[in-house]
């Protein structure tokens, strides 16, 4: 097993052990905050979450939607990514849909769905993505589909490998492949902590620059790192 100290040592090996321990301690403190904030979101009102989670660069989204095509949002599990479910509060006539793997515990599955819907966020099983998107296309509905790219996929011929924090790891490329299939625009999302319990959520546009099959996944991974 890789401990927090070992993980911290990988990308910043030049740091002293004391500084690494400080970084590790700060991480766990922030991680605990995120856990508590996730629980808090169950009872937060729209006004409360909008006060604490400000969606920046909305104009990028609206400009891309003028193409009359949905958008793929690539994100990582960084900062308070959970509250990104609230972006639907900011956008008119657009649904925020998070792609996820359903959990086996029916109680927590139902709770997770309920909390997302409370803040105009919706969850879509990764096993139903194509059927849902085809249906939405036929209805001319525009959505923002969120994909977390920093999971640990099973290695297959479609898996994209690259160095991340000095370790060669696999990344999900489903978001980019789906965007290419349906001709959707791709944007990056990044939450930044302003102070304890307060965040900004920034959207960054992207364009395909090369013939590399996972050009934008590479760009997003570099930004996330």
Residue positions per predicted region:
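Single conserved hydrophobic/aromatic residue that forms the stacking wall/gate
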Residues: 1-8, 219-225
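Residue-level recognition of short, structured coil/turn motifs
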Residues: 4, 12-14, 93
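Hydrophobic alpha-helix position signal
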Residues: 9-11, 116
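Soluble catalytic domains of membrane acyltransferases
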Residues: 42-218
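Acidic-residue sensor for enzyme active/binding pockets
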Residues: 37, 82, 219, 223
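N-terminal signal-anchor transmembrane helix
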Residues: 11-67
